[in-house]
């Protein structure tokens, strides 16, 4: 097993470990084909661990070189998932590329640089799941992500994407709750009850 991966699996679960796993995987690729981190693990990194998940989702393809190293490191393929049984690290590759209007970004966590979906596009994805799939956890994720990244959003891109995905009303609800709780986080029960109010 790769020495750097041995160090990673000894880390405490949380955003630092998630970033280390993402960085380890992305180093297996040449710059032009690095898979982009998306989904709940991207929310985890952008929120500094306010939300945590057990799996890492990437947009991209598994190269033959990456497949070989994953297998040698102890990962087993199950469809589009790669699972490391000893540590329960789950890697998923749900699609080959970001959507046409989606952007990638680079997020630095400690000394690690991670290729990740932009915070605006991640927020829109979570808002859409909350509104269209009636997923309360994505409502909570939307609020946590907005709270953590509100000062760094590209507002023009965010507005364009919310219109395209028909989630302006969901964004309005998140902004309203944010204004109410600018200086502190609402209690878990308050946030859960709020997230059940599907747009």
How does the language model describe each region?
Residues 1-199:
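Compositionally biased terminal segments of proteins
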């Amino acid at each position: 097993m790769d020495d750097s991966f041995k160090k990673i699996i000894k880390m405490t679960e949380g955003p630092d470990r998630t970033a280390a796993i993402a960085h380890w995987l992305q180093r297996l690729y040449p710059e032009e084909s690095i898979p982009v981190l998306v989904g709940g693990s991207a929310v985890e990194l952008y929120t500094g661990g306010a939300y945590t998940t057990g799996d890492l989702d990437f947009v991209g393809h598994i190269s033959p070189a990456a497949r070989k190293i994953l297998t040698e490191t102890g990962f087993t393929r199950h469809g589009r998932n790669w699972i490391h049984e000893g540590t329960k690290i789950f890697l998923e590759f749900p699609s080959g590329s970001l959507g046409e209007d989606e952007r990638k970004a680079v997020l630095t966590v400690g000394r690690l640089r991670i290729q990740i979906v932009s915070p605006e596009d991640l927020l829109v994805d979570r808002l859409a799941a909350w509104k269209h799939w009636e997923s309360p956890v994505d409502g909570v994720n939307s609020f946590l992500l907005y709270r953590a990244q509100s000062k760094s959003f590209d507002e023009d891109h965010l507005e364009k994407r919310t219109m395209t995905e028909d989630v302006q009303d969901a964004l309005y609800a998140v902004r309203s709750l944010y204004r109410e709780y600018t200086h502190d986080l609402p209690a878990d029960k308050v946030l859960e009850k709020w997230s059940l109010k599907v747009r």
